[in-house]
């Protein structure tokens, strides 16, 4: 191989390396005991489940990396076990340094429709409270970063007809209904009202 070929290959490799940008995200999964959080994490990380699952105690961490187009996306998944009894653990992983790239997923057990909305309301309020405290700390440490987080959450509602009725949680929050196969056997009228209620909670929280 000629010397020029070596330099050409080295140059091409360097260009390709620079072209592949890395993006890192933090995903926090919360919900009641037995709501399907671990199953959800396994699906998100393409983890093969072997044997019977054991209840998650405390915080369980998993890591996943995927290439999306020319970008390497790194996902840090934190599952908070123990339900609301250990809900205060949320503030240990959702702190001021993680707000910019954090996503929270609330797993709602749809096989328990009588309590699903009650649990959803609890977790939405818990997340809002933790995020508000983290933003207060961020405003002290980095006012510019805090302003950016807040602006991202509210800009899309400017001029919207429901703008005064919506109070968005400052970070991306996703509601996932689990065990829908069980919920699916409910009467159609019950499913209709439950879905309307879930949309209402999702809409009013941004």
Predicted regions and their residues:
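Short, flexible boundary segments at extreme N-termini or domain junctions of P-loop NTPases and their
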Residues: 1-32, 63-66, 74, 86-87
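Eukaryotic intrinsically disordered and solvent-exposed regulatory patches
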Residues: 12-16, 26, 49-50, 59-64, ...
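Structural beta-sheet core signal
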Residues: 29, 106, 175-177
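ATP-binding Walker
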Residues: 35
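A conserved segment at the C-terminal end of the G1
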Residues: 38-53
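Switch I (G2) and immediately adjacent beta-strands of P-loop GTPase domains
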Residues: 52-100, 108-110
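Inter-motif core of Ras-like GTPase G domains
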Residues: 87-150
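Canonical P-loop GTPase G-domain recognition
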Residues: 171-174, 182-206
């Amino acid at each position: 191989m000629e010397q020029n070929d070596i330099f050409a290959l080295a140059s091409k490799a360097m260009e390709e390396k620079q072209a592949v940008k890395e993006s890192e995200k933090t995903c926090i999964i919360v919900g009641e005991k037995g709501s399907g959080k671990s199953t959800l994490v396994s699906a998100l990380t393409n983890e093969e489940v072997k044997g019977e699952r054991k209840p998650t105690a405390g915080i369980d961490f998993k890591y996943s990396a995927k290439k999306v187009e020319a970008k390497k996306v790194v996902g840090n998944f934190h599952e908070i076990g123990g339900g609301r009894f250990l809900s205060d653990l949320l503030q240990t992983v959702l702190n001021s340094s993680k707000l910019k790239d954090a996503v929270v997923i609330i797993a709602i057990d749809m096989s328990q429709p009588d309590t699903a909305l009650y649990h959803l309301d609890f977790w939405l309020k818990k997340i809002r409270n933790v995020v508000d405290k983290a933003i207060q700390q961020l405003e002290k440490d980095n006012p510019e970063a805090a302003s950016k987080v807040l602006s991202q959450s509210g800009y899309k509602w400017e001029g919207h007809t429901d703008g005064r009725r919506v109070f968005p949680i400052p970070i991306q929050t996703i509601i996932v209904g689990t065990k829908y196969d069980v919920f699916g056997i409910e009467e159609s009228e019950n499913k209709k009202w439950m879905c309307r209620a879930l949309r209402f909670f999702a809409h009013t929280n941004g």
